[in-house]
Amino acid sequence: MEIGQYQPNLDGDGLRIGIVQARFNEPVCNGLADSCIEELERLGVTGEDVLLVTVPGALEIPLALQKLAESAQFDALIALGAVIRGETYHFELVSNESGAGITRIGLDFGIPVANAVLTTENDEQAVARMTEKGRDAARVAVEMANLAVALEQLGGDDEEEDEEEEEA
């Protein structure tokens, strides 16, 4: 049996990407942003097609993502932040709530959201992960934006066929 397959597409040319970056644990978050933006550029996303918004901390990320999603100006969104257990007594709350909120935005608005909010035990773990996780977020955003477009086109073909049948 032969099956259809979609090949991952990492061509960022023409894609609009919105990034929400937390400022809490700023050195780590800046490292995430730098590597993410560098990778977006490498994938063909231009600077004029990227909007970076900063918020106080991880719990504020979902609201900013929601506002960007509501604008309908972006093909994908990226969440950047760092929740470090030693930095806050309510680590689990911040980690769980920010993660759930970030996921909900993607599902509620039908827009890909790459979640690069690090949750680590200490600063050393966060620093060790920030560069690769920032790059990963860029790749996820571009790949999923292209996948979303391809999957939407599948649905669009059926609608056109239905309209043609109704006219006949």
Curated annotation (Swiss-Prot):
GO terms for biological process: riboflavin biosynthetic process. Keywords: Riboflavin biosynthesis, Transferase. The active site is at residue 90. 5-amino-6-(D-ribitylamino)uracil binds at residues 24, 58-60, 82-84, 115. GO terms for molecular function: 6,7-dimethyl-8-ribityllumazine synthase activity. Its EC number is 2.5.1.78. Pfam families: DMRL_synthase (PF00885). (2S)-2-hydroxy-3-oxobutyl phosphate binds at residues 87-88, 129. Pathway: Cofactor biosynthesis; riboflavin biosynthesis; riboflavin from 2-hydroxy-3-oxobutyl phosphate and 5-amino-6-(D-ribitylamino)uracil: step 1/2. GO terms for cellular component: cytosol; riboflavin synthase complex. The keyword Transferase applies. InterPro entries: LS (IPR034964), LS/RS (IPR002180), LS/RS_sf (IPR036467). It is an enzyme of class 2 (transferase). Coiled coil: none annotated. The keyword Magnesium does not apply. It catalyses: (2S)-2-hydroxy-3-oxobutyl phosphate + 5-amino-6-(D-ribitylamino)uracil = 6,7-dimethyl-8-(1-D-ribityl)lumazine + phosphate + 2 H2O + H(+). Catalyzes the formation of 6,7-dimethyl-8-ribityllumazine by condensation of 5-amino-6-(D-ribitylamino)uracil with 3,4-dihydroxy-2-butanone 4-phosphate. This is the penultimate step in the biosynthesis of riboflavin. Belongs to the DMRL synthase family. This is 6,7-dimethyl-8-ribityllumazine synthase. It comes from Paraburkholderia phytofirmans (strain DSM 17436 / LMG 22146 / PsJN).
